[in-house]
């Protein structure tokens, strides 16, 4: 079964609202073996919507729409779909009563505009909406299926999970399963080069790399007639990829880098403190996202000025004068200083030039040092990046977490 997702709403085209519906529906369809061939976004215009439906059904047998089911005049999805399928809109008394009851919960009375939401194509299956006043519906005709859903995610997602998935599962016999591997320390092009044989010879499963800030993900996707068989197809490909990429793979699924690092610290009961200059607390903020980190994360210091580095971290004045604050020597003294001050096993520091000003020929914007102290041993890493201030600060945090992860192995 081939599907298209058609999201309706001028607010989507204007960028006022992020289209999370398409992402959610695509993932859910993949889990039950339905392939999504196209995403479309269209404004609240009946003629354009009719043209989109005609185009979509030229190559798909399933079209799922979201949005345009509200009570106002520019909510035209229902009318457009009825016209496409050459169906009259008729009043559905049960839906009318449910809408009225729903409105009473908000101390509102039924209006003619709200009454519009109780009209549906004559031959359709109505999907109740316990979370709003816009029921959805399913219409089948001439080997075409249209599933019409409300736009707000808190209304659409429960309807999709409870009504749409059971309906679609009866129509398909295949299952698509995916596994995501998370990689950091090497870029997307390097990943693609290292696993080029796998990428060039893929059939089922397929392997697709995706670049994100500071990391690359690999999605391995298999299709079979059962979930178990699909997962079994993934196993040998995943094993081969892990052998090639080794510890550049830090996790899988929805696991974050900070979660992996925090788990190591907690499991090994290694206490940590952070000393940050250019990242200004972002590194500490990432670590404390993890529940339970309070047992090992003792302290975070933002030492932006030279004076605070000297007074708070015991960085030597002579070191600052000789090497400047942006140097491996200062990064190491910062890491050791915070660890000894806080009494922790680990101290980690960041110092650098995040921009947009402050760079020199010798210390350009994007020059970063990460210092690390682990139970008496010290390590330092130099980084050079180009980009805006936010990017440089964020990528520094990612690299600092990865530097710590690799040195804890």
Curated annotation (Swiss-Prot):
Pfam families: CinA, CinA_KH, MoCF_biosynth. Belongs to the CinA family. HAMAP family: CinA_B. PANTHER family: NICOTINAMIDE-NUCLEOTIDE AMIDOHYDROLASE PNCC, NMN AMIDOHYDROLASE-LIKE PROTEIN YFAY. This is Putative competence-damage inducible protein. It comes from Clostridium botulinum (strain ATCC 19397 / Type A). The lineage of its organism: Bacteria, Bacillati, Bacillota, Clostridia, Eubacteriales.
């Amino acid at each position: 079964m081939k599907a298209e997702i058609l999201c309706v709403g001028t607010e989507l085209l204007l960028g006022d609202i992020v289209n999370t519906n398409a992402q959610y529906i695509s993932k859910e369809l993949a889990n039950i073996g339905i392939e999504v061939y196209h995403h479309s976004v269209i404004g609240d215009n009946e003629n354009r919507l009719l043209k989109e439906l005609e185009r979509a059904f030229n190559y798909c047998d399933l079209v799922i729409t979201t949005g345009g089911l509200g009570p106002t005049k520019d909510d035209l999805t229902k009318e457009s779909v009825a016209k496409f399928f050459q169906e009259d809109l008729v009043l559905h008394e049960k839906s009318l009563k449910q809408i009225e009851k729903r409105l009473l919960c908000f101390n509102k009375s039924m209006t003619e505009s709200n009454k519009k939401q109780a009209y549906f194509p004559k031959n359709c299956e109505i999907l109740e909406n316990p979370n709003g006043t816009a029921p959805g519906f399913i219409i089948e005709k001439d080997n075409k299926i249209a599933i019409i859903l409300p736009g707000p995610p808190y209304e659409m997602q429960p309807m999709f999970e409870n009504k749409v998935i059971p309906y679609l599962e009866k129509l398909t016999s295949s299952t698509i399963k995916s596994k995501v591997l998370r990689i950091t320390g090497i870029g997307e092009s390097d990943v693609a080069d290292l696993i080029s044989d796998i990428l060039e010879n893929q059939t089922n499963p397929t392997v697709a790399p995706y670049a994100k800030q500071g990391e690359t993900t690999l999605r391995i996707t298999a299709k079979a007639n059962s979930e178990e068989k699909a997962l079994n197809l993934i196993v040998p490909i995943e094993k081969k990829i892990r052998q090639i990429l080794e510890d550049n793979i830090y996790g899988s699924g929805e696991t974050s880098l900070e979660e992996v690092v925090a788990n190591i610290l907690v499991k090994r009961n290694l206490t940590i403190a952070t000393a940050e200059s250019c990242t200004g607390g972002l590194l500490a903020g990432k670590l404390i996202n993890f529940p339970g980190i309070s047992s090992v994360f003792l302290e975070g210091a933002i030492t932006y000025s030279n004076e605070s580095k000297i007074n708070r971290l015991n960085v030597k004045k002579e070191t600052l004068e000789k090497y400047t604050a942006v140097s491996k020597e200062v990064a190491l003294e910062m890491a050791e200083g915070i660890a000894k001050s806080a009494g922790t096993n680990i101290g980690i520091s960041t110092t650098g030039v995040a921009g947009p000003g402050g760079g020199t020929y010798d210390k350009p914007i994007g020059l970063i040092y990460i210092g690390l102290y682990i139970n008496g041993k010290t390590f330092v890493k130099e980084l050079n990046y180009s980009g805006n201030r936010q990017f440089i600060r964020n990528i520094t945090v990612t690299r600092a977490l990865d530097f710590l992860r690799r040195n804890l192995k």
